[in-house]
Swiss-Prot record:
UniProt subcellular location: Cytoplasm
Record bears the keyword Cytoplasm: yes
Source organism (scientific name): Neisseria gonorrhoeae (strain ATCC 700825 / FA 1090)
Family the UniProt entry places it in: Belongs to the KdsB family.
Gene Ontology molecular functions: 3-deoxy-manno-octulosonate cytidylyltransferase activity
EC identifiers of the protein: 2.7.7.38
Described purpose of this protein according to its UniProt entry: Activates KDO (a required 8-carbon sugar) for incorporation into bacterial lipopolysaccharide in Gram-negative bacteria.
Swiss-Prot/TrEMBL keywords: Cytoplasm, Lipopolysaccharide biosynthesis, Nucleotidyltransferase, Transferase
Chemical reaction(s) catalysed: 3-deoxy-alpha-D-manno-oct-2-ulosonate + CTP = CMP-3-deoxy-beta-D-manno-octulosonate + diphosphate
The protein, known as: 3-deoxy-manno-octulosonate cytidylyltransferase
InterPro entries from the UniProt entry: Cytidylyl_trans, KdsB, Nucleotide-diphossugar_trans
Residues passing through the membrane, by range: none
Length: 253
């Protein structure tokens, strides 16, 4: 297994659930729960990257390594680029970006995403899982990804892609049958050198329109390998209902 580290971007502001990074989950802040879950992977190191002193204090209180970054970042990826530089991580080292609102993320998925980066010899890797629910296909909060024959991303979108034209014309709520529909899983792997390059790339109009940071990579002509997970991962925390569900899971552990 190639060595990798996990970096977790964490900010306090959240439009749908303010302060969620520090939301209590069975006695510990969510960001700490995420870091502890990531530590179950094969990562050599797990570090939280944040711009808020309260998150820094919470991590330090629970023995989680943390690095402070600027509060001017518009994406988690550019925050991690700054964190990697501050930590003096070597250019060849693999970084897995684990979102700060994924306290139930599977450690195996973290490992596999790093492996996919190496196996495909690409600049960036991510993951997706098959989608079978029509409402999710139409839901803009469920990001979809379509792949080429080699398993690389063609496009990510909040729109329903691929669009089932004939079924929609007929007024049918049917999923496309010719190919699998994939929902994107928000986990990324890249080497530190490419992470720094990403931060230097110009912002693409597509990422602005869709509010999807990974579209910058496609816009600038770099392939993104996509691992198709065998099953859907546990959902992250975006709303109070999500938080209540996750709290219930930890209460049973």
């Amino acid at each position: 297994m190639t060595e990798f580290v996990v970096l977790i971007p964490a900010r306090l502001d959240s439009s749908r659930l303010p302060g969620k990074a520090l939301a209590d989950i069975h006695g510990k802040p969510m960001v700490v729960r995420v870091a502890e879950q990531a530590a179950k992977s094969k990562a050599a190191r797990v570090v939280v990257a944040t711009d808020h002193p309260d998150i820094q204090t919470a991590c330090q209180a629970h023995g989680i390594e943390v690095v402070m970054t600027s509060n001017r970042h518009e994406s988690g990826t550019t925050r991690l680029a700054e964190a990697a530089a501050a930590l003096k991580l070597p250019p060849h080292l693999i970084v897995v970006n684990v979102q700060g609102d994924e306290p139930l993320i599977a450690p195996e998925l973290i490992d596999r995403t790093a492996e996919v980066l190496v196996e495909n010899n690409v600049q960036m890797a991510t993951a997706g899982h098959e989608l079978h629910d029509f409402d999710e296909l139409m839901n803009p909060n469920a990001v979809k990804v379509v792949l080429d024959k080699n398993g690389n991303a063609i496009y990510f979108s909040r729109a329903p892609i691929p669009y089932p034209r004939d079924a929609m014309r007929a007024g049918k709520r049917e999923m496309p049958s010719e190919t699998a529909v994939l929902r994107h899983i928000g986990i990324y792997a890249y080497r530190v050198g490419f992470l720094q390059r990403y931060a230097e790339m110009s912002v693409s109009p597509l990422e602005t329109i869709e509010s999807l940071e990974q579209l910058r990579v496609l816009w600038h002509g770099y392939p993104i390998a996509v691992e198709t997970a065998k099953e859907a991962p546990a959902a992250g925390v975006d709303t109070q209902e999500d938080l209540d569900r996750v709290r219930a899971v930890f209460q049973t552990v």
